[in-house]
Amino acid sequence: MNTLVHKAQKESVALLVNRIMAEKNPEDRKKTLKRLTTIMETFFGDLFEKESFDKARKLIDEDGKWFQFLNRALDTLNPNVVRTAVMDLGFESGFYGLRTRDAAKAKYHCNIPWAILFDPTSACNLHCIGFWAAEYGHTLNLSYEVMDKIVSQGKEVGCHFYLLTGGEPLVRKADILKLCRKHPDCEFHAFTNGTLIDDDFCQEVVKVGNLSFSLSVEGFREVNDSRRGPGVFDRVMHAMDLLRQYGIVFGTSICYTRKNIQTVTSDKFLDLLISKGAWFTWYFHYMPVGNDASIDLLPTPEQRSYMVRRIREIRSVKGGKPIFAIDFQNDGQFIDGCVAGGRNYCHINPNGDIEPCVFIHYSSANINDQDLIPCLQQPLFQEYAKRQPFNHNHLRPCPMLENPQALIDMVKRTGAKSTDMQSPESVEHLCAKCQAYAKHWQPAADKLWTDIIQADKKQTEQEIS
């Protein structure tokens, strides 16, 4: 699609977004939101089922939990932050970018990601016990020029969403802000320990508008600080207070293990996050990545079954919590399984190696030496594209954790090398740690999956009738 059409569509959407933000009367806001839905359907109805737009209208009409959630965001977040997030993550990435990505996928015969996760640095101001990224070492950095190259070339193929990890990405906060300013049509999201967030930084974030945060937290003060260091919990709470004060979008990033799973999903813990102003919480299943990684932290089948149900309880319209919970391992139902290998996202480590996933440290391509498209065309990514989904039970999505033989086969077939700079881990060693887990999880996962499919079928029948 030509740039004139893109510009006209973007201006039309921006006009309505501004009007929605200015509306104070709830009924007037509803009318404008429904008008925006109709315009998006007109522009992008060929990319989505009509049902998707109908559900959006129903959500607005029902005035339920998620519509109230949206209204709270519009009323409390900084206007520039809201406007930029809607235009960058919504219009550019979710709608317009999808058409561009589909065209690029057909042209280049490879997966084109919706989001690219990259590590500006391996450096960190903390020394957390068992952090997977520590395996890379602490002296690696992507230059600003390379980060700009990633974003610039990503935009050309429709990627407008960039996630930043590390190390601690805010060690490079000046370069991150520079990227945000240069690419105002992209949304950036940093996974951070939160300790480098201060007033001056928040003021700059509000100005750019296109940077949001996930703050890492492992539980309450005692548990969190036992892994991250004394005083870190209080510093994270202070960072949340600042972000809320400035109206900046933020949530949390939580790694759940056998030891903390009950705590980090408890009402008490979630109520704390909500009271601090968190809008969402990412839950990540512990992964035994690295030669020294312990399998003792892997959740039991009973614990993971609990997690599947608990996340759905938290999100539930009735009796849930006013926070959006996402479970990276257990929400495959909504995204057709594994999203790695460029299907929806990929990872670039601080050495420039382009990996299928933040947890899969194997590659045969490096962004320092190649352009983005050849990196996405690497053999390992092509194997991912051929084999996804790795399991039709989307509670068993991963080629490492739940289907370990799949990763062994792909790495061997493509000759991809370990990207661990300090202690390279063979794929056989990595996947051996997952064999027993996968075997014991399968029966519970299969029963849960059957229950979920039947529940979804029943809900669909009720909606039709």
Where do the protein language model's features map onto the residues?
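Short loop/turn microsegments at loop-to-beta-strand junctions
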Residues: 116, 342-344
